């Protein structure tokens, strides 16, 4: 079973914990600004990072992601496809939840980085 916990870094204690069902495993935790994002069973869930409570409904339904990154209000979902052929990176605008682009990339794309 998966779990998301919030730890008070000053006291090193868990001050909030959310348990998931035995077969649920949240992945790809991202924080941007005051928002916390994670992927679970084809959905992207969003909550407030400061007073976080696990949301009950996905903000966005997406295909399988091998990984995802949130950068400047965009979700970059790495789709490894069949893990033997080239994959894609899907770019979503989080203000509209619209798919903006699908980029063809190499085999098993794993991350997207911002180079400033």
Where do the model's predicted regions map?
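Short glycine/acidic-enriched loop and turn motifs that connect beta-strands
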Residues: 1, 43-45, 81-85
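Acidic, serine/threonine- and glycine-rich low-complexity intrinsically disordered segments
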Residues: 1-36
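Hydrophobic/aromatic beta-strand positions that recur at structurally equivalent sites within the blades
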Residues: 4-7, 45-50, 89-92
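A short beta-strand motif characteristic of beta-propeller blades
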Residues: 12-21, 52-60, 98-103
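Repeated scaffold domains used in trafficking and secretory/extracellular systems
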Residues: 22-33, 62-72, 105-116
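C-terminal structural cap/anchor segments
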Residues: 29-52
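Conserved beta-propeller blade signature
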Residues: 35-38, 74-78
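Blade-level signature of beta-propeller repeat domains, shared across WD40, Kelch, NHL, RCC1
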Residues: 88-90, 95-116
